[in-house]
Swiss-Prot record:
Species the sequence originates in: Emericella nidulans (strain FGSC A4 / ATCC 38163 / CBS 112.46 / NRRL 194 / M139) (Aspergillus nidulans)
Bias kind Polar residues: ranges: 34-50
Superkingdom of the source species: Eukaryota
Protein name per the record: DNA damage-binding protein cmr1
Chain positions covered by the region annotation Disordered: 34-103, 214-240, 282-301
Amino acid sequence: MVKEELSEFEKQRLANIAERDALLKKLSLDAQSTGVFTSNMPRGTSANQSKPKKKPAPKVKKEESLLPRRTSSRLRGIAADSEIAKRKADEEYDRRQEEERAKRVRKSDSFSFNDIFVSGQKLSGDALIGVDVVTKGVAVPYQRTFGEEDIKSTDDKDLKALRKEMNSLSLWEAWEPNRIKITPERIYSMTFHPSEAKPVIFAGDKMGHLGILDASQEKPTSAVKNEDDEDDEDDDDPDPVLVTLKPHTRTISSMTVHPSKPTHLYTASYDSSIRELDLEKTSSVEKYAPESTSDDVPISGLDMAAGDPNTIYWTTLDGAFGRYDMRTKRQSSATTWQLSEKKIGGFSLYQTHPHYVATASLDRTMRLWDIRNLSHTDPTPVGEHQSRLSVSHAAFNCVGQIATSSYDDTLKLYDFSSKGISSWKPGHILDESEMKPDTIVRHNCQTGRWVTILRPQWQLNPQSAIQRFCIGNMNRFVDIYSGSGDQLAQLGGDGITAVPAVAVFHRSKNWVAGGTASGKICLWM
């Protein structure tokens, strides 16, 4: 049989195939020479012995959960604008609204620590109680407005000594501030435990969490790395031991520990309740709330008189002021006054004369009240001073001075001790000139939406004659001022990555804490 001669097309096709095979062979040889591909090594070689081949983990077939499928209303024979479809949509909307409302309704039950425990270390009852001009509205992170030059230029010896002392405070060295996340959400309120034996800090956040930090703890020695231990994992550097509880369902707006009752922490919340946390018995009990859980009366402030550990005072976002003796069983016996038509953002008692109350309101006023002469129908203040914008807080110190912060970017100081407040009779009235502030300090108070409002907080029992208070600084510091308006210190440090807006003093020790919007704290001692 005569073999047919190949066509020109077939010859060209075979030539292309041969050329392609030659190219692939050449590429394979080049790759092996450069080590991209290695020839299979025989069993028993040193390479196989040094790196034994691991058996692959058996694959487990993941069973998919059967979820209900969405079905078209058209296929089910329901018209788009039918009453059935509308009713179904309304019911779904109502259900979701009810779920959201249920999350925010306060819980009136008594709780143990286990009931409200969220995270951290579960502690026994005795574990905790073992014993100056800023440009308006412009924040420049880490730019100081007070420093060493201001201290050197101080002429008054006592003031200079105090400035040196306060500026010598340094950040807690055990952990950097960005490692101390005391609450899950933005911090709204803080306080120190009155004990001088060790610094214990309580912080409340936006969602009702309560964080507790015992700053007497030391970093474990295993956490200190050697130079050779470069491959140590993060687990070898543990975070500080913290406790997180959830006694409230909404923002914890204020808290206090009475010095004569150091085992009890009182917290007030936007969920309309005031609760008592017994640190010794590890329990939480509601002490005051409206009779119905459907009544929404958010509490904005909480205070107690120094000589009375049984009576609580509070203000609300509706402008009311209340007083309640916790020894009475009926909460309906609480006394309330409507002091403002708008929100009262903060208030405080004059501790040595607790019938005097200072309130700060959204209506731009700071008012001074005398409870001894306070009418329920037409309450009249001892006096009032109006600022250009909203007043955020009014804080009394132990000698009769009031410090306020306001959205007009000022801190105002009122000295009523020089006006004889301790000897005033019921019905005493101050005129407009007597209510003017004695000192005005420029301070940036433009916190915006994401930073907690700046509020001054006095050291209630200072160990020298010079009164002092602290307040957050939008440049990521905490400022300390004297009762006469002189700046004493500007506390900062490495690792502070947010504004320590909620600043508090220990009542007698020179310990200062600042809380941030990320739930972290800075501690200077």
